[in-house]
Every structure is written in C-alpha cells, then in structure tokens.
C-alpha cells in the first residue's frame, strides 16, 4: 500500500473520530463521512498488520511443527529462538511494504519464503486498493455539502496532530504486542556467543 493511499485511509478515520469528538458531522472534501466509509477504512488500515502477523504465525508454526519440511528446504533460521521470530516478522513486514530488506540470519531464498512473501506482497498491495476505491466511490455518490460553521477544518495544526495520533494508535500499536514481547525476551535471554 503506497504512502498516499495509506494516508488517505488514515485521514478518513481521523475525520470521523475528530468529528464525533467535537459533536460535528464528519465531512471530508465536502462529503459526509459515515459508518460505511469508516468500516471500510478500518478494515483497510488493519489489513496490513493482519496479513503480516498471520503469515508470521504460519511460518513459525511450520518451523516448529514440521521440521522435516524446513530441513528439506535447507533450513531457515541461523538464529534460533526469539531472534528467529523477529527475522520472520521483519521478512513479512518488508514484503508487505515492498522495500526488499531483511535480516540476514533468515535463509529466505527457498520456495516457501518466495511463495509466501509473494502472496503477502499481493495481498498487502491490492486488497487495500479495493477498499480505497470503494470509499472513493461512496464519497463520489454523495451530494456536495458547502462549508459551514459546523464543518471541521482539515487544514489546521489540530487536525494534523489528530491525524498523527490516529496513525500512531492504529499503525504502531498494531505491532506493539509482538515487538514488546520480543524485546523483553531478548533482554531476559542469556547472552550466547555467536
């Protein structure tokens, strides 16, 4: 999902939340933002971390419960334990963001990783676009509402801060539990010589 499209989704959510917080009808670009747009925007915003976390769970399950399959592909992890989970999580995060980076401890040039990363890339790119086009279509069907005293201004510093808070809460906290647990476990693990 490209930055512009993600930002569009987060603006829809921020407009809706801000409008409800101050008791005004949520409007964006002269169109009312209602529950249908909000539901689609929420699904789109949560789809990205959902795909990443589900595929990380699948790869972890396969690594633990099907070691014969992992060994037939040459093994995946050079760093066992929780750092290996971090490597798997980062691999799928990198694929979903389409940036191509990764931890080097993960042996990811195998059929399993190539196929699953390709699936993550497709799901993370094209499914959100469907939702964003649906939101645009719903907004296009609505009548234009002229700006009034009750219209929430979207070009102010306050709205910018609200948008930042929404992005932080939804995007950053989606991965907070797994990152917090991995960090705590890394700290508590005894140091191993590599």
At which residue positions do the language-model features occur?
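Pore domain of cation channels
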Residues: 4-18, 105-140
């Amino acid at each position: 999902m490209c930055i512009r499209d993600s930002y569009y989704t987060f603006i829809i959510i921020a407009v809706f939340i801000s409008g409800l917080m101050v008791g005004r009808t949520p409007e964006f670009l002269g169109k009312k933002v209602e529950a249908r747009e909000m539901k689609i925007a929420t699904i789109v915003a949560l789809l990205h971390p959902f795909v990443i976390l589900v595929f990380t769970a699948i790869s972890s399950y396969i690594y633990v419960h099907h070691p014969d399959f992992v060994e037939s592909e040459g093994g995946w992890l050079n760093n066992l334990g929780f750092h290996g989970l971090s490597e798997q999580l980062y691999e799928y995060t990198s694929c979903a963001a389409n940036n191509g980076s990764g931890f080097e401890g993960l042996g990811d040039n195998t059929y399993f990783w190539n196929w699953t990363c390709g699936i993550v890339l497709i799901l993370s790119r094209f499914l959100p676009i469907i939702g964003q086009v649906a939101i645009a279509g719903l907004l296009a069907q609505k009548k234009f509402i002229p700006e009034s005293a009750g219209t929430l201004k979207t070009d102010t510093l306050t709205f910018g801060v609200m948008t930042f808070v929404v992005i932080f809460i939804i995007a950053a906290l989606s991965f907070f539990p797994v990152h917090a647990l991995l960090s705590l476990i890394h700290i508590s693990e005894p140091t191993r010589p590599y």
